[in-house]
Structure formats: C-alpha cells, structure tokens
Amino acid sequence: TDEAVNAIDLLDDLDDVDKKTKNTLLKVGVDTEENNRSGSFLQVDQSNVFTNNSMSSSVEVMNMAVALDKYNWLEDYLWKVVKPDADKYTAKTALREQESGVTSGYFVRSLPGTKEVMPVQACMFIGDEAVMQTAHNVIIAEENSELHLITGCATGDDIASAMHVGVSEMYLKPGAKITFTMVHNWAEQVEVRPRTAIYQEKNSTYINNYILTSPVKSIQSYPTTYCNGENARALFQS
C-alpha cells in the first residue's frame, strides 16, 4: 500500500508500509523486509498493527494481550520490577491498562537452552499528533538461553509533538543472556519516558545499549537492574 500507516491499519506484511515510513523505521534499526531477524513487532500509537512470530523456533513474539490470554502465568511478571506507582507515567500506563482492559506492548521470550543469534525487532511508532503512547513490554530469557532485541522508536515525518511512555520489564533466568538495543528517532517536541527494569538470576548477562539519533524536548530514563544471583553481570551504554 502507498497510504501512510495510521492507528487503524493492520498489516499482512511489514513491507506494506509506505516508502517514507520504511526509511524512518530503518533509521532506528527496523528492517521492513525482515532480513536477518528472528521476529518482528510494530505498534502504531496504541495499536499493534503487525507481529511475526514464525521466524524462529527459539523465540516467541506476540502482543501482550495475546500473550496474557495464552499464558496465565504471565500475570506474575507484570509490574514486578517496575512498580505502577513509581511515578505519574507508570501510573498513567497502569491506569490505561485497567480502564481499557488491554495491555499494549510486546511479549518476547527465548526458550530454555536456545541461542538465537538473529535479533527480534520491535518498533513503537507514533503516527498521530499530540498522542500519548504507552506500552508495557515483558521480555523473558529462559534458563541458558540467549536473546537479542532491537527496539526502534520513531515518529512520522509530519508529527511535531507527542509523548512516549515505554515500560519494559525483563527477566533473565540462570545462565541467560539478553542484549537489548534501544534506538530512538523522535521529533523535537516529543517527550520520552522509558521505564526499564531488569531482574537477573545467577550467571546471567545483560547488555543495554541506548542510542538517541535526534534532539527531543525532554527525556527521562534510569534503567535499573537487580542482580539476584552469583555472577550476574550487567553493562549499560548510551
């Protein structure tokens, strides 16, 4: 399709986005052709418009609403390392979940003993002016597994101002490894509020890379990891 992506478009193929959007996504590491990727997720404003969960037998990728319906135990991972009352942004995200009955965002899980070298790509895209986009993501690396994620976040070319609140909770089981690379390319009047926390068990390794490619109105970020096991290691770079 040559029409611009908006919040009501559901895509059969990630490559169906218009050329301008393709270029915007590529700037934040999201390849619409899905070359050398193990899964894909795209959220536009509050709507999940595309998910590809069929690219790897080692990794699960789905939107949070689907994941919560599939796995009863997933509730145990919600709002555990990021508290809903941590600040007004987490509170707004939690309230929106409660009022709508829908949890926006993505669920990614690497299966026990697997080592997927190709990254999952997830994109949070703001397509409407003055939107407050919220997302609540849960990432789980099961025991002795390895998982790589590229999270690319961007606004459409015609967007001047908006707010993005991304709550991400990550859990590394014993011997697991996650490399999490977040790339942001926002309009100048966008307010950015990532809220990231990680829980690590023994012998786990977490690597966090944050890249901001454009000026923004304001950004507040303080990613925090809890090393709850012997030889749990973490590295943060921005």
List each model region and its residues:
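Long, low-complexity, mixed-charge
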Residues: 1-101
